[in-house]
A protein has these predicted regions:
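Short, ordered loop/turn segments at secondary-structure junctions
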Residues: 53-54, 77, 116-117, 159-160, ...
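Glycine-rich, highly charged phosphate/nucleotide-binding loops
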Residues: 66-80
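Short beta-strand "acidic-cap" motif of Rossmann-like dinucleotide-binding folds
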Residues: 47-52, 155-156, 265
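Phosphate-binding loop of NTP-binding sites
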Residues: 13-23, 33, 37-44, 62-63, ...
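Short amphipathic alpha-helix with an adjacent loop that forms part of the alpha/beta core around
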Residues: 77-84, 199, 492-500
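Acidic, Mg2+-coordinating active-site environments of NTP-dependent enzymes
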Residues: 80-85, 90, 96-110, 152, ...
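Short loop/edge segments at beta-strand edges and connector loops
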Residues: 74-76, 113-115, 158, 243-245, ...
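ATP-dependent carboxylate-amine ligase
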Residues: 1-57, 70, 88, 109, ...
Length: 525
């Protein structure tokens, strides 16, 4: 974002523009930026004409223009397009050497760059940014669900197949029509990314779900990664910040950054599952009585220690999918339609935001949460084959995998896990994932190249593991594209192998399991 020329006009020049009754030409309306910019302008009553080199049938996000009155030229940038417009907005990805700029300059059409759009049209509603390592998508989707249930309309990017935390999406989404902007932010550990979003969206509140190792190489430092998430903390000084105080990394970060503002904490009162350790800000290792990976009760001699949160979930029953939330204004029973302790955390953070940010009553919140069926790809049941349940889950980092597998063990007992992950933490992360799989699953099918490589190493050291690790007939080829760790064929082979194991539940984990989940339909037939 910092390497892109975002603005072409000074603040003084922008303030002097007379945009009344002007027609805006947007290049690249089939792309993310062009699509969102066009809709922002139309939401504010402007006339927009679009153009894109894609054919109409290939325009990926065409359906998001349903309900809008927009003229679009597909397959070219015709002369008449330039004749009709008063201002033109090119996508930031368009090279300045592109021929279209010669036409623009020849016709002397004023250019507005993306940065000019950001300056001209600030968010006109309250904004909340949600970040953390795990739980962002579920928390964002659930808070939107609660808002809709209460009669509020959150802004929606409506870009089919796109997560809302990529590149410019959150910053542009906050400028679309709606009563409130509920934004998933901070998809990776890149410094400056969150800060840019906060600068452009001007949020008044935020949720920090947890901080665990993700998107890290073997040489990376969890605390450096935490500082990236700390950009949200910095940006919300003097404003509202909702945090999971069961996470010592978060509470230490707040202390390190000397946060002052409306800090609201949440956490669980639950029996710990095991002892865990994370690096403390003082340089020591901090021991955690873990409820789920990386969070629980803790006490470091440097002064970072567990304290009872403002909102706490008690009387948790995973069987009945309910818990009691105790907060500043009393105790209330919450019934969930989703499963697992990690989702109790997600629900609790959303409850706090619904109360403190949206100002909703517990009656509305209770009803809304009880009707939320979850996010596709999060412990999602895809169907049944020979009376066996097949599920997929996006878990792709060691902490997320451990949490999901632990909860599956509690809920379903014996199960088989098909691993399609190639950890962004490298070989170390792949080893952690297989160790967790051995701890919680009855059978493990390493379907990705990375998981198969680690499985072969484990079996070489301990041949008895072949009782639990079930290899596919085809050896996975070396493949990785960011967090995508397996091909469609490898996912198919993994699920086929999993169906031959003696359990009633099979779960495929990782981005590839989600991307290629349609292969499960082949087995249903």
């Amino acid at each position: 974002m910092n390497n892109i020329e975002l603005s072409s006009l000074s603040d003084e020049e922008l303030s002097s523009l007379n945009l009344d009754s002007k027609i805006f030409g947007v290049i690249g309306v089939c792309g993310i930026v062009g699509n969102l910019v066009a809709r922002i302008l139309m939401d504010r009553g402007f006339t927009v004409i679009g153009t894109d080199m894609s054919k109409k049938e290939d325009c990926r996000f065409k359906s998001s223009f349903d309900g809008y009155n927009i003229e679009i030229y597909y397959g070219s940038h015709p002369e008449e397009f330039f004749e009709k417009i008063d201002y033109i907005i090119p996508p930031p990805s368009l090279p300045k050497t592109a021929k279209v700029f010669d036409i623009i300059h020849e016709k002397n059409i004023p250019i507005l760059n993306l940065g000019d759009i950001f300056k001209l049209f600030a968010p006109d509603k309250e904004v909340i940014c949600i970040t953390g390592t795990n739980g962002k998508t579920t928390s964002t989707t659930l808070l939107k669900h609660v808002a809709y249930y209460a009669g509020l309309k959150p802004t929606e990017h409506n870009l089919k197949g796109m997560q809302g935390n990529n590149e410019f999406i959150p910053s542009l989404q906050s400028r679309l029509n709606g009563d409130v902007a509920i934004l998933e932010t901070g998809t990776d550990g890149t410094p400056g990314g969150l800060n840019s979003i906060i600068t452009l969206t001007k949020p008044s509140s935020g949720i920090l779900t947890n901080i665990t190792p993700d998107h890290l190489s073997d040489d990376s430092d969890l605390l450096d990664y935490a500082k990236v998430k700390g950009e949200l903390v910095e940006g919300l000084k003097g404003k509202q910040l909702i945090v999971n105080s069961d996470d010592p990394t978060i509470m230490g970060l707040i202390k390190e950054l000397s946060y002052v503002g409306d800090l609201i904490t949440f956490g669980l009162d639950e029996k710990p599952a095991k002892l865990g350790y994370k690096p403390c800000w003082c340089g020591r290792k901090i021991e955690i009585e873990e409820i789920i990976s990386g969070v629980g009760k803790y006490d470091c001699s440097c002064g970072i220690k567990y304290e009872k949160p403002d909102y706490i979930a008690t009387n948790i029953s995973l069987k009945d999918k309910q818990f009691t939330v105790s907060g500043p204004d009393g105790e209330y029973t919450i019934k969930m339609a989703i499963e697992g302790l990690h989702n109790v955390y997600n629900c609790l953070g959303v409850i706090v935001a619904a109360r403190e940010f949206l100002g909703l009553s517990y009656d509305i919140i209770q009803e809304a949460i009880s009707t939320f069926k979850g996010v596709p790809g999060r412990m999602e049941i895809m169907g049944f084959v020979d009376e066996k349940t097949i599920m997929v889950d996006y878990a792709h980092n060691p902490a997320g995998v451990e949490t999901v597998l632990r909860e599956l063990k509690k809920i379903y007992g014996d199960f088989t896990v098909v691993i399609t992950v190639s950890s962004e933490s490298g070989h170390k992360g792949d080893v952690e994932i297989l160790n967790d799989a051995l701890k919680y699953a009855k059978f493990i099918v390493p379907a990705s190249y990375s998981s198969r490589k680690v499985a072969d190493e484990f079996i070489e050291d301990n041949p008895n593991l072949t009782e639990n690790i079930v290899l596919t007939d085809q050896i996975p080829e070396e493949f990785r594209k960011r967090t995508l760790g397996a091909t469609k064929e490898e996912v198919y082979e993994g699920i086929k192998t999993g169906l031959n194991t003696d359990v009633n539940t099979i779960v495929a984990i990782g981005e590839a399991a989600i991307k290629f989940k349609s292969v499960i339909n082949d087995f249903k037939r």
